Amino acid sequence: MSVRLAISDMIMKNAADWQKPFARRRGMGAISRREWLKGAAAAWAIAQGSSVAWGAELPHARPAKPDRHFTNPAVEALIPRVQRGIGDPALQTIFENCFPNTLDTTVYPGSFAGRPDTYVVTGDIDAMWLRDSSAQVWPYLSLAKDDPQLRALLEGVIRRQARMILLDPYANAFMRDEKAAPLSWAVHDKTEHHSGVGERKWEIDSLCYPIRLAHGYWRATGDTQPFDAQWKEAAWTIVRTFRVQQRKQGQGPYSFQRESAVPSDTVPLSGFGNPALPVGMIFSMFRPSDDACIFPLFVPANLFAVVSLRQLAALATHAISDAKLASEAESLAVEVERALERHGKTQHPKFGQIWAYEVDGYGNALMMDDANAPGLVSMAYL
């Protein structure tokens, strides 16, 4: 599933660099930013099932006010303030359409056991991904401290994520109804099924993103209400799952197979993945793109795990006063970090030692990157 944060900003920052090699290869002048935006707008409109004439202004594409899932005054007030600082009308419209989109179309606020509960549909599929939901609400953290309504929405995401992790720490996606059957394409997967799980692809980042969101929420608001006994148990579950997937004591309980014509949609060798040495890194069967790993020691997700575990240690120390959890999280972070330094790099013929994308601990390395986060390029963001 796609992480759709700051996409337009990243595109614009790199657009000029993308144009140069394209122009050289094609023997043509670089297109203007305006022309590039219009082309992007046309592609966006096609994807949305609407049409935009070449040369037309970008459409104002927010749902009508009665159809918006969640409206927040602080968010609405921020939009025109930011627009006034943007000189390009097309970028103004992109921001107006994109910044509130999560609130307009994907959140379902409610309550569970008397506490805030927020279901966040990933957008194109009626299921909640741990990764996507964390990323979708991230842009609103800076507004939450002084806004109880927005704070409750975010608390609801954190609480629901904790329940999801306790339901199955190896799952990447969950259904709205915790008793529901899986997503249609996952019904016949050969793995341990649990009610309420949409899909069970083991990805390290699925357990990193909820920590990132919880830590970001705490830093932004100072609020510790979401971090109750249930959240603490979910945090311990994350640490234990990472430990098991270091595979020092065997392969662990997780395996996954799917009958598919697409090799990247299933896991080889009886669902436990290609061979790799237990060097201290955490094994992952899938990438954040939901494609299977070739080598199970997935470097970007392990780098992300080091950061997330240290964020968890900070939360355990300052938000919930659990010294043992803080110690366990920091100890694991140190161990994974050392293993990455020793095994996560490879030698490039021109640039010397660089991070690999995936390794197996035997000396084999995959040299590539993935458009999703975590990837090597996105490490600075995470």
In which residue ranges do the predicted regions lie?
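Extended ligand-binding clefts on enzyme/binding-domain cores
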Residues: 130, 166-177, 239-306, 318-319, ...
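Active-site-adjacent bridging/hinge elements
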Residues: 103-116, 180-189, 275-287
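Short, solvent-exposed segments of well-ordered alpha helices
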Residues: 120-127, 194-201, 205, 229, ...
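Sec/Tat signal peptide C-region and signal peptidase I cleavage site
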Residues: 52-54
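Low-complexity, Ser/Thr/Pro/Gly-enriched N-terminal "stalk/linker" regions
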Residues: 56-131
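Well-ordered alpha-helical scaffold segments within catalytic/enzyme domains
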Residues: 74-87, 135-148, 209-224, 303-322, ...
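Aromatic-rich carbohydrate-recognition surfaces in CAZymes
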Residues: 126-154, 158-264
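N-terminal secretory signal peptides
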Residues: 1-32, 42-48
